[in-house]
A protein has these predicted regions:
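N-terminal targeting signals for export/organelle localization
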Residues: 1-44, 197
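Short loop/turn microsegments at loop-to-beta-strand junctions
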Residues: 42-43, 65, 162-163
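Short, acidic, Ser/Thr-enriched surface-loop or helix-capping motifs
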Residues: 49-50, 169
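Generic structural signal for well-ordered beta-strand positions
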Residues: 55-56, 175
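Short active-site neighborhood of thiol/selenol oxidoreductases, capturing the structured segment around
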Residues: 58-81, 85
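Structural microenvironment flanking redox-active thiols in thiol-disulfide oxidoreductases
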Residues: 82-140
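Thiol/disulfide oxidoreductase modules built on the thioredoxin-like
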Residues: 136-190
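C-terminal alpha-helix
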Residues: 190-197
Length: 197
């Protein structure tokens, strides 16, 4: 019994030593994300849409936006995320709310304008693909605290990356996130709030 009591304090301290840094990282992440805006990050870079047009922040004025980073060779996470988002939004489309989904490639080496254009034919016209020079993509992704890493795979490579969807309100400011694997009910509630339904 005494041994158990003696272990409680050390174990508690060890637990706190582990949890405090994790908590700090999470809090700092959301603090930095909450100060982001689409305007401040898009105007710093030169990106092109899948239609070959230079991206202009004016195109997204007064439009709620969902921002997602991925790549066209992504086998599961990217197509599933885009499909789930659009399926949930379709349930709300009867309200005729305008919105945009920005799909930013983390693989501009392969994801040219033409490749992005072909890939996005699988989704509806609300999805806009963005690509550009690698340094421009890197800058934009880092501004949104995106983790990504090229991983060799067979004769080619894949990319491990953050699978979070960023919600941006019609003022262009960060309004929350949708996590990979989040339930449809949770996504629906968040989208209703974003779209003011």
């Amino acid at each position: 019994m005494n041994i158990k009591k003696q272990l409680i304090i050390p174990c508690t301290l060890i637990g706190l030593l582990i949890l405090i840094p994790i908590y700090s990282v999470v809090v700092n992440y959301f603090k930095s994300a909450s100060t982001l805006s689409l305007k401040s990050t898009l105007t710093e870079v030169n990106l092109f849409s899948h239609l070959g047009k230079i991206v202009d922040i004016k195109d997204f004025k007064d439009t709620p936006t969902l921002l997602f980073f991925g790549f066209t060779h992504c086998p599961e996470v990217c197509p599933t995320t885009l499909s789930n988002l659009l399926n949930n939004i379709e349930l709300l489309e009867k309200n005729k709310k305008n919105y945009r989904v920005l799909f930013v490639t983390l693989d501009p080496e392969r994801d040219t304008i033409n490749i992005l254009n072909d890939y996005l034919q699988n989704f509806n016209s609300s999805v806009i693909g963005l690509t550009g020079e690698l340094n421009e993509i890197n800058k934009f992704a880092k501004n949104w605290n995106i983790y990504w890493e090229k991983v060799l795979e067979g004769d080619g490579y894949t990319i491990n990356h953050t699978a979070t969807v960023f919600m941006i309100n019609k003022k262009g400011n960060f309004a929350g996130t949708i996590a990979w694997g989040e339930s449809d009910k949770s996504i629906e509630l968040k989208l209703k709030k974003l779209l003011n339904l």
